Amino acid sequence: MEALRNCSVEIQAGEFVAIVGPSGCGKSTLLNMIAGFDTVSTGDIHVDDSLLAAASHPPRPGPDRVVVFQNGALFPWKTVLENVMYGPLRQKILSRSQAKEKALDLLRNCGRLDAVAESYPAQLSSGMQRRVEIVRALMNDPRVLLLDEPFRAMDTVSKTTMHQHLLEMYRLCQKTIVFITHDLEEAIYLADKVVVMTTRPGMIKKIISVRLPRPRVPEMLSSREYLEMKREAAEGIHEEAKKAFERGEREQA
């Protein structure tokens, strides 16, 4: 089954890009191809001048691209600090003392998470666990941070809080971020541009440049510029949802 077709998008270094579209349109497939988890049947993917994936090039995951998935992936038997230190120690790119210093610095700068450094994941709220996972991803100093609907299961208040934490992390690290979401409000509020995809096979329907200044604040959600961009994105999504419905497609997670 063809998941994606003619998907061409250029992402600048340090840019925050959100990808939205109907369920089953290939958003997560695209992210997995960038990550090096899925095979590319046609076309290619580059980061800077490096070829990451192509039809003749086997998938190649690497520390330059780190994924934070929908479901939690912290090691329950390790403390927060041990979880964050895990990547560089496993790859033997930092000594234990260097890894500890870097981990504590990241935790401190990302919402004072150093206060729970010796806690275990089960002792943290779901929102705090998500923040630790993002810090652990940043610990590997990736060029690209890939976020696959990380806040999907959260209530509105928790999600709003996480948005502010993520925006602060982005301000501090200035990494390139690819963010998959179903939530148009979330996509526009967080990103520099929003890629709207069609129904399966997923193609890029439109790319919306977000005309909101940084730093982002919740009051922007009621601004005229925001509401215009949300309407534009929603129209594209609704058109694709109608096409899927008329073809009798069943929603896929």
For the regions a language model picked out, list residue spans one by one.
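Short helical segment in ABC ATPase nucleotide-binding domains corresponding to the A-loop/adjacent helical element
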Residues: 81-90, 100, 104, 209
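Catalytic Walker B motif of ABC-type/P-loop ATPase nucleotide-binding domains
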Residues: 145-148
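The feature captures the beta-strand-to-loop junction immediately N-terminal to the Walker
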Residues: 20-22
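Conserved ABC ATPase "signature" region
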Residues: 51, 96-115, 168
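Hydrophobic anchor residue at the start of the ABC signature
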Residues: 134
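Conserved signature/switch motifs of ABC ATPase nucleotide-binding domains
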Residues: 122, 140
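ABC ATPase NBD coupling module
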Residues: 51-69, 90, 96-97, 219-222
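Helix-to-loop junction immediately C-terminal to a conserved catalytic motif
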Residues: 35
